[in-house]
């Protein structure tokens, strides 16, 4: 990899790490009631794993993504410099400024939605199966591996669909909490 491409990847990974830190890390994701509820609903709706979640993902999520990006852009464009300063002073229980937490929450909402649609496209792809079948030949073991892969991606995908829906509530809660913040006293 050339130097400029390597630098761009390092910057990209660094920004993702910063977002994840401000969001609360993987522990925050896996401990989230929204994620847990999404996982439970996915297990209860085994039929979705087959392929129904793909249709849901590709029909629901793009509209939600447009709404998310629009809300994110509008919210951050109307916040005044004074309010941004105040939001940097208000910290959550982990010591992360509320402005960074709010930003990370909206980014997480968008990131999960994009991931959901991406997984749906990968789930429906057949190129890898076709290439391996051509190289190795038809094999029941190969078919078993691909069946297991489709079940796993179906579970992941349906969980992401539910999680994307529930994250709309999380984003609304951030905006609601923003309205309840009291400006800190001058020092």
Which functions belong to the PLM regions below?
Residues 1-40:
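N-terminal juxtamembrane cytosolic/stromal segments of multi-pass membrane proteins
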């Amino acid at each position: 990899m050339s130097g400029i491409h390597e630098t761009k990847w390092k910057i990209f990974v660094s920004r993702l790490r910063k977002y994840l830190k401000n969001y609360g890390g993987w522990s925050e994701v896996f401990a989230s009631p929204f994620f847990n509820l999404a996982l439970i609903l996915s297990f209860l709706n085994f039929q979705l794993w087959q392929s129904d979640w793909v249709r849901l993902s590709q029909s629901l999520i793009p509209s939600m993504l447009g709404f998310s990006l629009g809300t994110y852009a509008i919210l951050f464009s109307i916040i005044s410099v004074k309010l941004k300063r105040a939001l940097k002073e208000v910290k959550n229980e982990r010591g992360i400024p509320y402005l960074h937490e709010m930003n990370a929450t909206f980014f997480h909402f968008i990131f999960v939605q994009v991931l959901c649609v991406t997984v749906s496209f990968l789930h429906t792809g057949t190129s890898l199966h076709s290439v391996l079948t051509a190289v190795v030949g038809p094999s029941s073991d190969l078919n078993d591996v691909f069946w297991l892969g489709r079940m796993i991606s179906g579970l992941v995908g349906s969980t992401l669909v539910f999680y994307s829906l529930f994250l709309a509530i999380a984003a609304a809660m951030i905006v609601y909490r923003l309205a309840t913040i009291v400006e800190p006293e001058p020092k």
